Amino acid sequence: MQFKKLTPPTEGEKIEVKDGRLQVPDNPIIVWIEGDGTGPDIWRAAHPVLNTAVELAYGGKRKIVWFEAYAGEKAQAVYGELLPEDTFKAIAEYIVAIKGPLTTPVGTGFRSLNVTLRQELDLYACVRPAKWYEGVPSPMRHPEKVNMVVFREATEDLYAGIEWEKGTPEAQKVIEWLKKEMGVEVRADSGIGIKPISEFASKRLVRKAIQYAIDNKLPTVTFMHKGNIMKYTEGAFMKWAYEVALNEFRDYVVTEQEVTTQYGGKAPEGKIVVKDRIADNMFQQIQTRPDEYHVIATMNVNGDYISDALAAMVGGLGMAPSANMGDYIALFEATHGSAPKYAGKDVVNPSSVILSGVMMLRYIGWNEAADLVEKGISETIKQKRVTYDLARHIGVEPIKCSEFGQAVCENMREIAKKL
């Protein structure tokens, strides 16, 4: 693979796909993108945590070989563009990548860098776990009941970026066409956006969500939609979701209706209950009955909203990991923004990118290292050694971003001694 300005590591081996499965060497090359704003801060904490976990879990027999690629402001400085071809090529070639937050100029016509990465690499599933860690302040009375994973379709819906500004020739042309050809009146001073929801994209997203529930022995998958209003987009998503469940996973699933009519209200042992919820009701459900939901499969906009709401319930975006997945390529990322006003101040919570690293470790099958990181973070928070975002709720003096990373490493070493 030839790059314009990137130099691959001289050590390490590529992760490969054979017979539909990842083949992970003991020294995999993993692409990382520092990100903008607080990106350098969180990575100075995260890299030592992930490296220490791997070293402790495998006695030095395994090691991540990091390969830096560029996006955002750093890419602009190196390449003169925000998202160079080298970065797409590196992620596609090495399969697994992880990144910090990226800044997209607002209202300037630039498409979101995060959206562009997902669309160009066909990373169609945005996977967002929401899990509470003991000691994290939460507005919920029982945050320990929140343990869900959102599968959000990431290439379509209103976030596809098919829109035109009010007053442009393109917007006027669409408005005129709608009136002339479809008999639909739209105000002349409107901006226009298109909401595509396809059968293909919907079904592959749901397929991935149900397979995740099977692999992780989770009891429910819920299809979230607003099909009562948007019948031919969100309603179609619900219809296609059930088709996947009942045509492709019939041996594994039972519908909520079948549980009621055929099984006396109790799901049969070993079966996954598939059900659907109207989007606005879903926001009530996650607060009032969180333990009844485990995997949520939904479209792009709904998924964005519900995953951020869930993050707030378990400690905020600073505690929220994320992954963008295709069939094999996976890009893990911090969910929070670049927070430029805090850049270089060593104050932000690095847990989002660290926990995204946990997801990454599980994706490559290194569960022992992933478990160690989670235990290290949990222990550090229980000790009330936390950054300002959590400290202000707990009523303790905050520690620095880098100090949090050091504390997690210390706790992992103590935990490893007892294993």
Where are these regions (language model features)?
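N-terminal phosphate-binding or glycine-rich loops at protein starts, especially the Walker A/P-loop
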Residues: 3-60
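N-terminal beta-loop-helix "entrance" segment that forms/cooperates
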Residues: 59-83
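Buried hydrophobic positions in well-ordered alpha/beta secondary-structure cores of metabolic enzymes
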Residues: 36-39, 95, 151, 209, ...
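Glycine-rich phosphate/nucleotide-binding loop
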Residues: 2-10, 73-76, 283-385
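Flexible, glycine/charged-enriched surface loops at secondary-structure junctions
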Residues: 58-65, 216-225, 249-275, 366-374, ...
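Glycine-rich phosphate-binding loop
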Residues: 90-104, 248, 252-331, 412, ...
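N-terminal glycine-rich phosphate/adenylate-binding segment common to multiple enzyme folds
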Residues: 74-181, 301-305
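Glycine-rich phosphate/diphosphate-binding loop of Rossmann-like nucleotide-binding domains
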Residues: 25-26, 31-47, 173-277
